[in-house]
Amino acid sequence: MEFYLEIDPVTLNLIILVASYVILLLVFLVSCVLYDCRGKDPSKEYAPESTLNAQPSIRVVVTQHSAHASHWARGPSLHLKDPAPLGKKSTVV
């Protein structure tokens, strides 16, 4: 007596799809372990990563002029009792 299991084509396609995703996941995990999860080749030597203190600071300088003729050129603004004195402002990032 012959015994075989008949599988529906939709079920077979689903099994193949799940198996292919499992294989892709395993390949990804193995490559992640081999390449240190950062895309770097472990057989090569890389320079050490630079720290944040070694980066040069960026200085932003904003200059405001207090000419009355250019008031309407700047656009609408909110007027308060004591407007802040205009001048040179700088921010170090």
Curated annotation (Swiss-Prot):
The gene is Smim36. GO terms for cellular component: membrane. It comes from the Eukaryota. Keywords: Membrane, Transmembrane, Transmembrane helix. The keyword Hydrolase does not apply. Residues 70-93 are annotated as: Disordered. It is found in: Membrane. The keyword Hydrolase does not apply. It is a single-pass membrane protein. It comes from Mus musculus. The chain crosses the membrane at residues 14-34. This is Small integral membrane protein 36.
